Amino acid sequence: MNKQDFYFDLPSELIAQYPLANRSDSRLLIYNRQTEEYGHYQFREIADFLQPGDLLVMNDSKVIPARLYGHKATGGKVELLVERITGDFTFLAHIKASKSLKSNDLIYLDAGKRLEVLERQDDLFLCKASENILDLLNDLGHIPLPPYIAREDESLDKERYQTVYAKCAGSVAAPTAGLHFDDAVLSSIRARGVNIAYVTLHVGAGTFRPVRCERIQDHKMHSEWFTVSPDLCAAVKAAKSMGNRVIAVGTTALRSLESAAMGGELIPCSRDTDIFIYPGYQFKVCDGLITNFHLPESTLVMLVSAFIGHQECMALYQEAIDKRYRFFSYGDASLLL
């Protein structure tokens, strides 16, 4: 298939620039693969469409304030986006500067803090901080909003560009399907008899990388670290043995589960994955998916297309556009069953 097969015309005013006042105020478009029927609801109603014994798998990765601003000794401005923390003091980052940096160069930040460039690794730079990097980011870092949100980060983003159940620091982009869940929704889901389990996948900046190949099969996915625990594997096995559904909350949770089951059986693991899911992929674990509405020609639209069918995906997105759903990270959600 070609990249153009996944194009749709999205009015710019449907790209959400801010979150709604309340997380669960977002709209929910439900699509049933068996009946091919749509339903339009509020996200706070989602428990009504889940069944006792269903297993929701959520990504508990926490967004770090990964964007830093500094300057070189010459005064030239430097902007960093931390891609991956590799140690207490070391990390890999994308760096923007007027002139490319090299080993041993220093980057000066506010409050007397500084970074040292250790080496270049392909498109990234391995750097060392003058103190614990997570502490430094919490002091000076900015929330790294996606490129399609055309504004600077604000104080509200520290709370709202984060799921309420985020626990494991490491993502530079939010697992956005989880942004709709608040405590009341989670309580209603548990009261319904639905089980919840967690996976961790640290979302990298590569999630926004466009597909540049005409043939989608030629696209090379970015790599992200994930972990699937023995407890999660046991929960999935228990749900499947009872004939219950495993529903991924977000494409990151889905990609983690499918990566851990590449041999045909879900096994505990902690490693990198660059799994690329597009039409023709045979799903091994997931029976349902909760996800936002994604960019035209993106790998995430290709994943949705693989899950519900290509024509069905394009029709679903046209339905969302016609009904004025909000798109992308701060937008509305879909439940695909």
UniProtKB/Swiss-Prot annotation:
Pathway: tRNA modification; tRNA-queuosine biosynthesis
Pfam name, any one: Queuosine_synth
Swiss-Prot/TrEMBL keywords: Cytoplasm, Queuosine biosynthesis, S-adenosyl-L-methionine, Transferase
Any one Gene Ontology BP term: tRNA wobble guanine modification
Domain of life: Bacteria
GO molecular function terms listed in the Swiss-Prot or TrEMBL record: S-adenosylmethionine:tRNA ribosyltransferase-isomerase activity
Known EC number: 2.4.99.17
Gene Ontology terms: cellular component: cytoplasm
Catalytic activity: 7-aminomethyl-7-carbaguanosine(34) in tRNA + S-adenosyl-L-methionine = epoxyqueuosine(34) in tRNA + adenine + L-methionine + 2 H(+)
Entries under SUPFAM superfamilies matching the protein: QueA-like
Location(s) in or outside the cell: Cytoplasm
InterPro entries with a match to the protein in the record: QueA (IPR003699), QueA_dom1 (IPR042118), QueA_dom2 (IPR042119), QueA_sf (IPR036100)
Function per UniProt: Transfers and isomerizes the ribose moiety from AdoMet to the 7-aminomethyl group of 7-deazaguanine (preQ1-tRNA) to give epoxyqueuosine (oQ-tRNA).
Assembly and oligomerization: Monomer.
Similarity comment: Belongs to the QueA family.
The protein, known as: S-adenosylmethionine:tRNA ribosyltransferase-isomerase
Organism: Legionella pneumophila (strain Paris)
Gene name, Swiss-Prot/TrEMBL: queA
